[in-house]
Amino acid sequence: MVNIRPDEISSIIRQQIEKYDQDVEVANIGTVLQVGDGIARVYGLDEVMAGELLEFEDKTIGVALNLESDNVGVVLMGDGRDILEGSSVKGTGKIAQIPVGDAFLGRVVDPLARPIDNKGEPASNGTRLIESMAPGIIGRQSVCEPMQTGITAIDSMIPIGRGQRELIIGDRQTGKTAVALDTIINQKGQDVVCVYVAIGQKASSVAQVVSSLQEKGALDYTIIVTANADSPATLQYIAPYTGAALAEYFMYKGKATLVIYDDLTKQAQAYRQMSLLLRRPPGREAYPGDVFYLHSRLLERAAKLNSDLGGGSMTALPIIETQAGDVSAYIPTNVISITDGQIFLSGDLFNSGIRPAINVGISVSRVGSAAQIKAMKQVAGKLKLELAQFAELEAFSQFASDLDKATQNQLARGQRLREILKQAQNSPIPVEEQTAIIYTGINGYLDDIAVNKVPDFIIKLREDLKNSKPEFGESIRSSKKLDTASEELLKKAIEDVKQGFVKA
């Protein structure tokens, strides 16, 4: 018979008790009540946070937006075709965040920062919340550096500064995206990181943007975030916040950044769709009550940081599409009141051949000359007034037959000024050449040149300054002002070029 040794048995039991280790994982689980139209109603999930990411059985991710007494309204970030009634939903305990890093430059990503350009996964330096807090009042400084767009009409009359929010507004097909892309192309060599956010656009349009940026060598410092027209409304809604989060990563490293939201009308429509499906009460134009907050919390993230925070900046160029030039609709008025000015593009001007079709009368920059170099302030001070007076006279002169000499001269000057502000797409002009062009027009040097010859004259003048008098450009780039020596050089260049152009 075997001897039973109680001490041995008790030591074995003690060892097993010590080794016993049970990991208890507490999960927040709910059940799908109904699903459809990109919305799921979920029962349970008592511990869920507003905006928390939820994972469904088929690995679809959703965001908890409506926290009601008996269920949770969830918007889906996928089509959710495999989600069934009664299937389980798990809370992740995380708020939406994306990977960020320098490797995202030159890449095309979706609103969750997943690459869609078949170039592999970009290396990330960490993550950022998609919806992070905007910098506070103390962390900011006033806008003081220019963000040159390369478009003469904008840089002279509606200047944009680093850290400003300038709305680009107009009907469809008036060149809104062209203005934004020209601005990106003009940042080449300026050490500015650009983010282009395409919301609800055709995939072919986005492909065109990518190829034109690539052609101009601008893709190397640009990140493209796209939620195409066939993407779920949730992705179209979060795309601008993703773009802002990517730009913030660079801004807090002390860099200047430029973000283009193309366009926020489609984001508002996606948000309206989600809100109505979640049965939130509709307001004006069926938009939910918090549609103002939708855009204000996005655009407030644009800032010029003070030197303690590294002095970085985020400049925002939101785009809004109007219907038949109606700027008094709900979304346009909201965004106009949030931004620091607007550039209004007119369909009538566009169709009459004035491109970029900027309506100078109702376009404004609330930062003003603080965002201009001194040379531009010196020459462009009177330009807006001259053009406004010309527009008034032109309308009046259609009814009057005999005009006095002074009026005729003013009309002739106005026609030439309008001509010098015309510009081809994807061909930004450096600020020193813009200064020369405006100086020539505003001081009457073009008055004796035929209107149809003005564009050729400007091309020749730019060539002459670049090739024969490079010190003019160097002087303005270094001193930022038009001194007497530079002015004499410019006058000499105008005289030299004018010899082949004077009206017969």
Swiss-Prot record:
Keyword check for Thylakoid, yes or no. yes
The annotated site for Required for activity falls at S363
Q: Which SUPFAM superfamilies match?
A: C-terminal domain of alpha and beta subunits of F1 ATP synthase, N-terminal domain of alpha and beta subunits of F1 ATP synthase, P-loop containing nucleoside triphosphate hydrolases
Q: Give the reactions, separated by semicolons, that this protein catalyses.
A: ATP + H2O + 4 H(+)(in) = ADP + phosphate + 5 H(+)(out)
The record's listing under CDD domains reads: ATP-synt_F1_alpha_C, ATP-synt_F1_alpha_N, F1-ATPase_alpha_CD
The protein's matches in InterPro entries, at most eight in alphabetical order, are given as: ATP_synth_asu-like_sf, ATP_synth_asu_C, ATP_synth_asu_C_sf, ATP_synth_F1_a_nt-bd_dom, ATP_synth_F1_asu, ATPase_a/bsu_AS, ATPase_F1/V1/A1_a/bsu_N, ATPase_F1/V1/A1_a/bsu_N_sf
- A cellular component term, taken from the record's GO annotations: chloroplast thylakoid membrane
- Which key words tag this protein in UniProt? ATP synthesis, ATP-binding, CF(1), Chloroplast, Hydrogen ion transport, Ion transport, Membrane, Nucleotide-binding, Plastid, Thylakoid, Translocase, Transport
- Major location category of this protein: plastid
The UniProt annotation places ATP binding at G170, D171, R172, Q173, T174, G175, K176, T177
Q: What is its EC number?
A: 7.1.2.2
**Origin, by domain of life?**
Eukaryota
Tell me the compartments it is located in.
Plastid, Chloroplast thylakoid membrane
- Topological relation to the membrane, as annotated: Peripheral membrane protein
- Specify whether Nucleotide-binding is a keyword of the entry: yes
One Pfam family linked to the record: ATP-synt_ab
Q: Molecular function (GO) terms listed?
A: ADP binding; ATP binding; proton-transporting ATP synthase activity, rotational mechanism
**Cited function:** Produces ATP from ADP in the presence of a proton gradient across the membrane. The alpha chain is a regulatory subunit.
Matching PANTHER family: ATP SYNTHASE SUBUNIT ALPHA, MITOCHONDRIAL
| Family, as annotated | Belongs to the ATPase alpha/beta chains family.
Q: What's the subunit arrangement here?
A: F-type ATPases have 2 components, CF(1) - the catalytic core - and CF(0) - the membrane proton channel. CF(1) has five subunits: alpha(3), beta(3), gamma(1), delta(1), epsilon(1). CF(0) has four main subunits: a, b, b' and c.
The protein's name is ATP synthase subunit alpha, chloroplastic
Species per Swiss-Prot/TrEMBL record: Porphyra purpurea (Red seaweed)
